[in-house]
Regions:
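Radical SAM/AdoMet-radical enzyme domain recognition
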Residues: 1-63
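Auxiliary Fe-S-binding modules of radical SAM enzymes
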Residues: 47-55, 65-197
Length: 197
């Protein structure tokens, strides 16, 4: 609960855990929990998250930390790599590549003998920008072609037809990019919680 409050600054861990249970009880599937490991804060909880995946039969996805919300990108931002997460989990569990085919960024693993899964979203140690087909919709209505985009298109008030045209245009723009990794060319003053999937 202490780390939860340090990271989120709002809400209660117990409420989140009840929400996860409610989603499972309602038959929503798959239930996926995203977590960003922050060195010195919650990086000792990797196995706790793996245990959660096993105990609840859900997917826990580890996302490498990216510079957001005013992080100073002129300094190296520490993160926990995909390799470290795998090494730690394999101390307790056997992981089997899940072989799921999707347009998502995660590398998925089944925890052998359980319904639990682990996903790795390794934007820093194994960039996947050249494979990304996702757009992002911010909480204030801007459609972004990329997670690290500084500018987007305001779609609030547009008709469905206009939004469809904007989406098609952004996908054409993405297809023409020769982008190997996120640039994070300027410090984000936007919280990741305000950027949708």
């Amino acid at each position: 609960p202490v780390n939860f409050r340090k990271i989120t600054r709002v809400g209660e861990l117990a409420d989140v855990l009840r929400g996860i249970d409610a989603a499972i009880d309602a038959g929503l599937a798959p239930v996926k929990i995203n977590t960003v490991l922050i060195p010195g804060l919650n990086d000792q909880e990797i196995l706790n998250f793996a245990d959660l995946a096993v105990n609840k039969g859900i997917s826990v996805r580890f996302i490498e930390r990216m510079p957001f919300n005013g992080d100073d990108i002129t300094k190296p931002l520490e993160f926990i790599s995909e390799a470290k997460v795998l090494q730690t989990i394999k101390e307790k569990y056997e992981l089997v590549p899940a072989g799921e085919h999707s347009f998502g960024p995660a590398k998925n693993f089944q925890i052998r003998g359980t319904a639990g899964k682990i996903g790795l979203i390794s934007s820093r140690s194994a960039p996947f920008c050249h494979l990304c087909r996702r757009l992002r919709l911010t909480s204030n209505g801007f459609l972004l072609p990329c997670l690290d985009s500084q500018h987007g298109t305001n779609v609030r008030g547009m008709t469905d037809h206009e939004i469809k045209n904007v989406i098609a245009s952004l996908y054409r723009e993405k297809a023409s990019w020769q982008k190997n990794k996120a640039c994070f060319a300027a410090t984000f003053d936007r919280s990741l919680s305000k950027i949708g999937g």
